[in-house]
Regions:
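Catalytic cores of secreted/periplasmic lytic hydrolases that degrade extracellular macromolecules
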Residues: 1-95
Length: 95
């Protein structure tokens, strides 16, 4: 995984600090959906979710500012998503 701290911040934000039902019941850390059905993927273990993030999202990344790249590809619908990722990163930096 490239930019693991940012990816961790994404997982934290997407799952509400790993408390969401999607995380707990389906082991989906990133809100990944099947583009054909629009349904959330279900994984047997959280590590499968990380692998899926790499193969379905990060494989497109060719370098540069990762946060800007996430914004450019429209990773999240929330227009404040990148600001929220930065907020989580700052929080993690204080830990």
């Amino acid at each position: 995984i490239r930019h693991p701290k940012i990816v961790l911040a994404q997982a934290i934000l997407e799952t509400g600090w790993f408390r969401s039902p999607l995380c707990r019941n389906r082991h989906n850390l990133f809100g990944l959906t099947n583009p054909k059905t629009g349904k959330y993927y279900e994984f047997n273990h959280w590590t499968e979710s990380v692998r899926a993030y790499y193969t379905k999202v990060q494989y497109k990344y060719k370098g540069g500012n990762y946060l800007l790249w996430l914004h450019k590809i429209g990773y999240a619908e929330d227009p404040r998503y990148i600001r929220e990722i930065i907020r989580v990163l700052k929080h993690l930096g204080k830990s």
